Each structure stands twice: as structure tokens, then as C-alpha cells.
């Protein structure tokens, strides 16, 4: 608060505006929700832990103890960091990277996983927005918006479960709340005259040029 007050702000200010608000906003925009940054990785069920893009020494003691236990039980710990300090010093593998280029490396990793189909398709279909239909109507005000239930003649209750997916068994668009067993992750469909595509297909399309070679030129990681 002291730093912000030097600029005469009438607003309440504390360290959270610098160390936590950005994290919360990023998580809300990317995965639809937020939790305190010390939520931590699921090391109890992991065999490989990659730490990157984080102010590692800001983490709490419980995470330090969890990593120690993870390594003792045979887990592999990889640290991606410009300098080998803190957690990087005890990592099984340290990957030096140019500062500020973590995003490019993550895009390249995503490119490989998506194109090699080495990800958990059932998890993506059931627990992410990957199957949710996006309106593909360039020039329209609806272009790029998720197809919601009201667009498909459903009650206009704006809830994530009211977003639509393509049910491969019923061969039609249904609400997420109906919990279809096989929502499509790829394809082009028409619902009430609107062309739609699953969000996952748009993600795959956006990753097309994010090859490891592309990322290497940016990150220095080969």
C-alpha cells in the first residue's frame, strides 16, 4: 500500500495487487476460475513435475516439503529457469531459457502434444472447454463467441453448463449440463443456421505454426 499511496491513489492497495491479482485474472481468462497460487501441483499422483514461469522462491514451505517427498519417491523434477538458483539447483534437470519466453515454449509443447495426440482426450472432452462450440461467422457480431443454450432454443441462463457441445452419439448439439458421453473435439457443424466449431479445433489450428523449431529461435531451448 505504501508504494501505491506515493502516487496519490484513493483506492485500497496492498501487495496482493502485485503478486496475486495478475495470477487470478490470468486463470479466470484461461481456465475459467481461480484459486490461490499456493494451490500447488498434484504431486501425489504425478511422476513428472515441470516448474516454469513462476517466482519459485515465493512458494510456501508446504510446496518445498511436497517436492522433497516427490523426489524421494522417485518423481522426476524439471525446472525451466534462466538461472540455476532456488528450486532449479535441486532439479533433476535444469533447462535454461531466455527470460520472458516461457510462453513460446509452452506453445511448442502444446503443438507437439496436440498433433501427436499424446494427451488425455477423455479428460479434455469432459473437463475443459475443448468441446464447447464456438460460432464461426466472420463479419457477424457473434463470431468467436461460445454457442449458448439460448442460441439453440434453450432457456437463456448464462452458465458454463449452458454452453453447447456436439454430441457424437446423438449427432446434434446439446447443453453441457446434459453431460454427453462423447462430445466432439473436432469438426464443423451447423446449429440453427450458425456455423460452429469446437474450441479444441480452434486451439489446434492456432498452434499450427508453433513448432519446436519456431520456439527454439525465441527461447534458446533446443
Q: Which role does the model predict for each range below?
A:
Residues 1-45:
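Anionic-ligand anchoring segments at beta-strand to alpha-helix junctions in alpha/beta enzyme folds, i.e.
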Residues 7-8, 73, 89-91:
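Short, structured coil segments at secondary-structure junctions
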Residues 46-57:
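Short acidic, glycine-rich surface-loop motifs adjacent to enzyme active sites
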Residues 56-65:
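Glycine/threonine-rich flexible loop motifs
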Residues 69-76:
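A short helix->loop->beta-strand "cap" motif at the edges of active sites that frequently abuts
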Residues 80-86:
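Short, polar loop motifs at secondary-structure junctions
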Residues 88-222:
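Long, well-ordered, tryptophan-enriched scaffold segments
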Amino acid at each position: 500500500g505504501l508504494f501505491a499511496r506515493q502516487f496519490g491513489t484513493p483506492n485500497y492497495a496492498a501487495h496482493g495487487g502485485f503478486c496475486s491479482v495478475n495470477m487470478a485474472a490470468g486463470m479466470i481468462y484461461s481456465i475459467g476460475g481461480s484459486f490461490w497460487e499456493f494451490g500447488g501441483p498434484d504431486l501425489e499422483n504425478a511422476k513428472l513435475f515441470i516448474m516454469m514461469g513462476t517466482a519459485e522462491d515465493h512458494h510456501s514451505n508446504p510446496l518445498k516439503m511436497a517436492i522433497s517427498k516427490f523426489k524421494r519417491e522417485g518423481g522426476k523434477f524439471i525446472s525451466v529457469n534462466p538461472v540455476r538458483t532456488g528450486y532449479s539447483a535441486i532439479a533433476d534437470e535444469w533447462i535454461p531459457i531466455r527470460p520472458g519466453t516461457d510462453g513460446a515454449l509452452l506453445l511448442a509443447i502444446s503443438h507437439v502434444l496436440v498433433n501427436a495426440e499424446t494427451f488425455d482426450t477423455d479428460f479434455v472432452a469432459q473437463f475443459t472447454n475443448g468441446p464447447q462450440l464456438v460460432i464461426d461467422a466472420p463479419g457477424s457480431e457473434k463470431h468467436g463467441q461460445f454457442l449458448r443454450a439460448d442460441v439453440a432454443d434453450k432457456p437463456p441462463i448464462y452458465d458454463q453448463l449452458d454452453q453447447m457441445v456436439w454430441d457424437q452419439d446423438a449427432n446434434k448439439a446439446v447443453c453441457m449440463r446434459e453431460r454427453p458421453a462423447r462430445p466432439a473435439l473436432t469438426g464443423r457443424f451447423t446449429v440453427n443456421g450458425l456455423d460452429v466449431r469446437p474450441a479444441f479445433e480452434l486451439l489446434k489450428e492456432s498452434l499450427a505454426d508453433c513448432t519446436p523449431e519456431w520456439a527454439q529461435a525465441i527461447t534458446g531451448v533446443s
